[in-house]
């Protein structure tokens, strides 16, 4: 079974605190399932279930819960299993979730364990508790196959932070030429600069391809690696069940001969596997593949190699050769730590970096899969890797996230190993607070069904046109001034017009009080309102305070509002999963001062929300800033 390591650690914590059950080593959940003597189908659980597989598992579980009496410790193990699966967490929040027994069971246990979850998550949040000595050498190893996303940013910032008095390596993991493109190296470097990471040395995994090949031969000569032509599905089944490969005991000379042929582009059905322990409870040690054939020209080495090392094999060796002293990685791969040190020890490499693993950032309703994002980019569901619906750094910034806010939030999460799903509203709330002071204020209304207002004085004459300079934001005068024109012909929104009653006195913001004299309505749509100016009126006494634009001093512009990339459909079909309502566009009318707003500038449209200028006269609504209409 494949488990979420950090969530599994919580199960250890819960069972020890609540039931005095001794914590388990990896695989944690599997050992608890066996100790509690739960049915075998629980061992089929995986955090990487497809939608169909998860549905099948939940069907079995729902029936099982109906017909089984549970003690508290067994219930907590099952709860921990479900709690560790982000796909399940998202699914159970959906109102259409159909497994009644599971919903009742999970919510009951969740409420019971709420304080334990809070205690666990608070243990080291916000702290950087990584003990290191001397000059630290860290590495950030992105694969050049896409843009940096929110999941990469924490790793990049922590590596940079820990290397402040040492050395940071940006190592491009180019061990799979099928996925990699040179252009991605450039955009990753640009993204790192955006994050303020500028002191580093660039290296590549391919710098060590010759050494890695020789180390693979060394493992064969030590009897610690063998060539295997077992097909992929059978190999997966054998590793799952702890069955040795038919080729596991092939003699050294035969393995050396086959490996040599592999390197020449022959024996294409073979791979090289490390000979570790095919029955180990930690399945990462069950003879992992360390070399395989890839028929694709490499960006750097061109056609020199026909076979390439896997990341799991290359990573510890290159870390050692590059002088890395601290290897930071997300704890979902903690089961590979033992494998990491096995390679270093068997190859007698003197530099053994210290591994420190931390929890990855998981956000609600956020796609972090590079494969899925690439599908939406390649098939033009989105405009590119910087589309505001994507969780790439560029997409998030384009949606209106302030870079300093993002860095502040991530660093404040610390090096915690506790995994949790973060709600975006917390980050965007902090973002709103940080951009408020630098956001100039403007007035605007939707163009559709906008309402013309004629303003008269007490003698029923059109008022005299007045021009006035006012601050763009009264609380930050450094943003400068803008000019507003007060004349007899203005526009307000249909929504605002609908709330006004005849003879009502209300306030036009940045102007004064007005009295409704007449409303002209055609087919239920207000087309015109006659107002009487009453500047002597007290703005404190009016219920409605509305925004307006001058009819002769306006500019058309576009507002874009983005939603989540995917819908709630229970399907693995990415096209069907795409949220077709994830982008909305509207034409608005605003004061002409908006024409001078440059891209990447923050503004507030009063009584509407905060926006970021995407391009001239195009503004993106920043999430969680849409305001309730102030009456």
UniProtKB/Swiss-Prot annotation:
Keyword Aminoacyl-tRNA synthetase annotated: yes
GO molecular function, one term: glutamate-tRNA ligase activity
Reaction(s) this enzyme catalyzes, per UniProt: tRNA(Glu) + L-glutamate + ATP = L-glutamyl-tRNA(Glu) + AMP + diphosphate
One BP annotation, GO: glutamyl-tRNA aminoacylation
InterPro entries: aa-tRNA-synth_I_CS (IPR001412), Gln/Glu-tRNA_Ligase (IPR050132), Glu-tRNA-synth_arc/euk (IPR004526), Glu/Gln-tRNA-synth (IPR000924), Glu/Gln-tRNA-synth_Ib_cat-dom (IPR020058), Glu/Gln-tRNA-synth_Ib_codon-bd (IPR020059), Glu_tRNA_lig_a-bdl (IPR020061), Ribosomal_bL25/Gln-tRNA_synth (IPR011035)
Binding site for ATP: 149, 332, 367-371
Gene3D superfamilies given in the database record: Glutamyl-trna Synthetase, Domain 2, Glutamyl-tRNA Synthetase, Domain 3, HUPs
Subcellular location: Cytoplasm
Keyword line: Aminoacyl-tRNA synthetase, ATP-binding, Cytoplasm, Ligase, Nucleotide-binding, Protein biosynthesis
'HIGH' region, short sequence motif: residues: 144-153
Disulfide bonds: none
Pfam family, one: tRNA-synt_1c_C2
GO (cellular component) term, any one: cytosol
Residue sites binding L-glutamate per the record: 139-141, 173, 311-315, 329
Primary enzyme class: ligase
Family per record: Belongs to the class-I aminoacyl-tRNA synthetase family. Glutamate--tRNA ligase type 2 subfamily.
Name used for this protein in its record: Probable glutamate--tRNA ligase, cytoplasmic
Taxonomic path: Eukaryota, Fungi, Fungi incertae sedis, Microsporidia, Enterocytozoonidae
